[in-house]
Amino acid sequence: MIRFDGQVAIVTGSGRGLGAAYARLLAERGASVIVHDAGVALDGTGFDPNVANAVVSEITTAGGSALPCYENIESQGGCQRLIETAISQFGRLDILINNAGWITFTPLEEMTPALLERIINIQIAAPFWLSQAAFPTMKQQHYGRIIFTTSGRAMFLEHALPELTGYALGKMAQLGLMNALAVAGAADGIRVNAISPVAATRMLQRAVAPQELRPEQVAPGVAFLASAQCDVSGIVLQASNSHFATAQWNVSAGIDAGEAVITPEAIADQWSIITGV
């Protein structure tokens, strides 16, 4: 049975939705969890500690171990303080789940510097700084699990939306970071993977049937990636409606012109072979 007894987890953005489901499941299976959430509104403004507090209360009432953290992780310092909170309160850090995100439905032509900066801070910089702060402790322990969050809206052309340019940027950047950290942490027992979830959260912004797209149907996949039983890195696990699959990239056989320098016309003539379709 997969358990997390004696382990410590941070789940960013875990006051609601997917993050809350992850935090509850990890705590139910023995982990001590830092429930991180500043309780901001959909537009990223405001502050409400009750959002994280409610999940902590739910966990502790059920007999689990959890503490809230309200740090603003849009800066390196905030990320460092979040990691330090887990270590100072529980003495170690085993699991980092980079779940916090932000969506702005803004086409390329309408993107502003302020909007792009916020996307970069939350979707790219925060996972980077949090991982940087967590790495020394995980290396010292010779154990760690880091999970990033990506999206089919970024990975696949057929699911892309023109108003999600910034969102797609952030979600693909996390996959590059996943691969680099998977190599960096391999010798020290640090495994790094990603989840690509679809769930009915406030960010989805569309109505679904009550029994569809529940965050609880995604959480088991994240729990596996966070466990000792998951001893691989570089996996992108797609999860929705209790359906789980891995997203994989393949390189076509292509053509090989040897030492010759071929023409663009030759590329055009053999395009179907190069693309494999």
Residue ranges: model-predicted function:
Residues 147-173, 178-179, 183-186, 197-211:
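Catalytic loop of short-chain dehydrogenase/reductase
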Residues 3-34:
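Canonical Rossmann dinucleotide-binding motif of NAD(H)/NADP(H)-dependent dehydrogenases/reductases
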Residues 131-132, 179:
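A short, exposed helix-loop element centered on a Lys and neighboring polar residues
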Residues 194, 210-277:
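C-terminal helical subdomain
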Residues 4, 62-65, 78, 85-98, ...:
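A glycine-rich helix->loop->beta "capping" turn
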Residues 21-25, 29, 180-190, 228-231:
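Active-site-adjacent segment of SDR/Rossmann-fold oxidoreductases
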Residues 107-108, 115-117, 166:
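Substrate-binding pocket helix/loop in short-chain dehydrogenase/reductase
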